[in-house]
Amino acid sequence: MSPPRSALYVFLFTFLAVLYSLTVPLFEGNDESWHYAYVWHIAEGKGLPRQPPDQYPHLARQEASQPPLYYLLAAALTRWVPQEDLLALYARENPFPTLLPVAHRDNQNHYVHTDAERFPYRGAALAIHMVRLLSVLFGAGTVWGTYRLARKLFPQEGWVAAGAAMMVALTPGFLFTSGLVNNDALAACIATWALVVLLNRRERKERQEKQNLCALCDLCGEILSGLLLGAAALTKLSGLLLWPFAALVLGVYHEDTKTRSLKNFSFVSSRLRGFILIFGVALAVCGWWYLRNWRLYGDPTGLAAMLPLVGHREMGFGLMDFFQTEARLVWLSYWAVFGWFNLAAPGWVYRVYALLTALGVAGLVLLIVRAVRQKRWGDLAGVGYLALWSLIVAVGLVRWTLTTGGSQGRLLYPAVGAHATLLALGWAQLVPARARRWLFPALGGVLLALALWLPFGVIRPAYARPAPLTAAEVADRVSQPADVRFGESIYLLGYQVDAKEVRPGETFWVTLCWQAEGPVAEDYFVSLSLLTADGLTAARKVTHPGLGTFPTSLWTPGVAFCDRYPLTVRDTVPTTAAGVLAVGLTTFTERLPGYNKEGWRLGDAFRFPGPSISVPDSGPILDYRWGREVALVGYRLERAVLAPGEELDLTLYWRALRPLGGPRSATVQVLRDGGYKIAQVDLPLNLEPGEVWADHRKMTLAADAPPGVYELKVAVYDPTGGGALPVYAGGRAFPAGGLLPLWEIRVREVSQDHQMDVRFGKMIRLLGYTLSSDDRVEPGDVLTVTLYWELLAQNGRPANSFVHLLGTTFNPVSGNFLWGQGDKRPPINWWEVGRIYEDVYAFQVASNAPPGEYWLEVGWWDPSTQERYSPQILKGEGSVLSEWDSLLLTEIAIP
């Protein structure tokens, strides 16, 4: 069996890349919408975009700072296509996309897609697919160039060249990237062919010396080398990395192709003419672009204008931080991370590539050992050639990552041909030469199966809408029917919770089934929360229905469907708590009211039992690290629901990871979005390595703090002016500023005339009351009492409230009970935990009521058992327990 020719792999790659391109919805690749905006800006005759976009309007954002070669080619290809509908594509942006790679379906789409994008393509969809095909051609050129590169370096290893081309053609990440609108495929193609041409030029130089060939061949090679170097720098800034590589390869040594030994390390002066020609041509190709940047931004690279848009890396992020937190993401995304860097493959896929990589590296080590022993310097030179370019590209990626957050494997694709050749060379060393004819086809079968499965098994399901269901199918998918209406026409048909108990950091799934009875003009989001007994949010998901793919305006009336929503419990939940799930429909400005089947209004959310949250008695176990110095390993919070002016009691547990790099202080703040702060305490950290310190703090909330939910946040900073240290957890960096959201603090409303704290069982609390008259009413008058209740927890049992006016014998007095809100509002099991409710009752005192002292009696009872909930009086004076297990609220005098 002879090795396949390069044409086979070029064809195979083209087929697969087109398959990926057609499978991925428009704009669902890294920055694809911004890359295409660059193309469109040129195609519309507006020239090259300038920065910043708020001053020179365009939609390309930071991508407008990219060198223009790819975009000029794409604009020339699509200039004739009408694209009046393009802005409608940009208008359908998903406000809640997933930002990190996850292997389950969850808002991977950055845009909402409609049938207007389907085949046959027209307008903007046609133009975008045309540019995607252009990228596919550049990717195919990379496959062909990889084959030529391997054949040039290792001409006796035919299966190595075939294996290298096969590896590039079947790498899912490269297939995905080459099927999108971006400049990565062109950058990879140019870099790969530059490696080939640089080899050709060295060989032509030697043939000229030995065979006295005409200098024209060498001149053409130098011009072609310069064209490729210039094109690389005009495609992507990383293309400039080819320049020092070319100088090093051409200037330091040349290779004798007959003996394949390193024999000449002379200074590059003998090749000064060639250098001037090569780099002169390169500058002629790309120099105008860098001069333009210098004139516009004072920086030839344009980074001075780009970095404010893409964002600078947090202060203190170093090389060790990269390897500890983001190198793994580079590895994953090199092989198979899709979407906007947010759609991962199953874990076993990466284990396959890890095994293949490990085998390739082991084989390379074996090759190097054998080559040294056998003095095969040519093989070592070939490995060094590829390894040097791979190292330069990797250093460039790390340098970029230390500047801004851009840790993605696609940035290594300029060296994809070198990587594939090295891996194929390593695999070939692990088997006898005769077995390679079976090894590479077997590996190709595995890689082909993976590359074919991923579009259908991972990519397509992530962007699919929920399937329509019959009533019977809905009943099979839910454990509890709901029949709750939101607004005028949207119904929640039922639900199912997949877990009964969860721990901090765990993800569980909730199934909700929906149906619209009429057209819905507005796009409403699903807001699903897991609440603790204090009504604080332990987990939350806000999304378009269909996990981002099926906005309500696209629903068909009368068609039901079910969604499965992932909820990840915050790892900072402070204590074990019963969980209550709350679901509602909302926009950015309004929340739809909910109604049960009896027509009772449920507020703006439907509540149903959720899983309990199990937290160790010692508190949550954490590992949040500021820099590489200090870790927060746990905390304890005494109370999370407080009144203005009350004291927050907090203990933080710190551990020093190494000697501190200078003075360090920790700040604890209670604040809202926008920075409105109601409490702050700063204390210095004095820790020895390995020591765990219990940092006990008491903070008084502002006396005028408005009621609502606030964030409790923690940060470590340099008090001498160095700023906050970056904070990391599990490889994830938090936003700049180093503030870690720890938990929520609810500030309750205090507006009652008479404040108290009386609990009825463990479920509800009376916070206070107001009376229409102080403590005196006339016979025949109307007495109105307003009670302020707070729900502490949901236990799933019914409860009704009551209010009586008792006489001196503690029996209800005669008179007319006019009305009570407790008889008209929804049952308590619809209440929201932590929310304060007003309960208003009115009595008309009998006209013949005898004078005397009367009591107002309040309480709660269970209608299923007829038993009352005993009050526990925690605050207030003059209150006593009645013989009926109720609270005697206050005395009322009738003269």
Task: Give, region by region, the residue ranges found by the protein language model.
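Signature aromatic-anchored transmembrane alpha helix within multi-pass, membrane-resident enzymes
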Residues: 8-11, 227, 279-283, 387, ...
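Perimembrane helix-loop-helix junctions
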Residues: 197-203, 210-223, 242-283, 372
